[in-house]
């Protein structure tokens, strides 16, 4: 299966998934959503709308909102921005981020920015499984400085692939949001993957598709976009991975490899 990913038309398949996930024909979207809930064990009791037939299309279900109060926001300085599992975390040594045992990639490659290679001290990589809540929230109070769309591959980001393919996160398509906080600049990296139909933010809307072949930078210094800890910042329209990069003056991370997190839970 790993080798097959190099042969598959990754972007074509993701575009097809984008269209399929927006089919509004009731029997198609309801049957597929019902299968998905059963296959992946989605807890619909948490959803604000529990009736799967009430969703406009599959993507509407996939990016569903939760009932009020289910994700309380911790008083700690930094919270988990998503529901998911910690696939890696720790210190960034010599500007290298651990991907898996024996594999790493550079900060500059991930961000497509050599000037930020030595800007961060620690990281957390959080994998969102198909059953998870797929909205992304602010890990702390911050002001949006800039955002960068970086084109790339669309390899799967499941653990088997991450353990097998070098530099997956710095090779895959990604969207990087830079925020100024009380303890310095943080980066929230949304990593795309095969079948991730699109990524979107609250301030720009849908970023992909269309897919481009060049890096695109968005500057926000004059717009004063301020977000509070726990505010929604974006969504995966089909899921993937979020990487959080923290600066040297940030509180220390207090999470473990393999730990399951809920959005709003303290990570420091």
Question: What does each model-identified segment do?
Answer:
Residues 1-268:
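Contiguous, well-folded functional domains in the mature portion of proteins
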């Amino acid at each position: 299966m790993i080798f097959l990913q190099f042969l598959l038309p990754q972007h074509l398949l993701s575009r097809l998934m984008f269209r399929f996930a927006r089919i509004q024909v009731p029997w198609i979207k309801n049957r597929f959503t019902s299968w998905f809930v059963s296959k992946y064990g989605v807890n619909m009791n948490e959803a604000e709308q529990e009736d799967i037939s009430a969703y406009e299309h599959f993507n509407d279900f996939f990016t569903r909102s939760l009932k009020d109060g289910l994700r309380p926001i911790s008083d700690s300085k930094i919270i988990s921005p998503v529901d998911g599992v910690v696939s890696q975390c720790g210190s960034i040594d010599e500007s290298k981020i651990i991907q898996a045992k024996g594999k790493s990639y550079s900060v500059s490659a991930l961000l497509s920015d050599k000037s930020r290679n030595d800007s961060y001290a620690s990281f957390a990589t959080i994998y969102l499984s198909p059953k998870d809540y797929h909205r992304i929230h602010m890990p702390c109070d911050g002001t949006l400085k800039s955002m960068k769309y970086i084109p790339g591959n669309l390899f799967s980001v499941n653990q088997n692939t991450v353990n097998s393919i070098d530099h997956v996160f710095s090779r895959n398509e990604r969207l990087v949001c830079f925020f100024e906080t009380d303890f310095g600049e943080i980066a929230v990296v949304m990593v795309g993957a095969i079948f991730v139909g699109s990524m979107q933010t609250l301030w720009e809307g849908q970023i992909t598709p269309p897919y481009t072949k060049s890096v695109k930078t968005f500057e926000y210094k004059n717009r004063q976009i301020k977000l509070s800890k726990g505010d929604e910042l974006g969504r995966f329209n089909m899921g993937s991975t979020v990487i959080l990069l923290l600066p040297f003056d940030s509180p220390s991370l207090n999470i473990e490899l393999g730990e399951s997190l809920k959005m709003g839970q303290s990570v420091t």
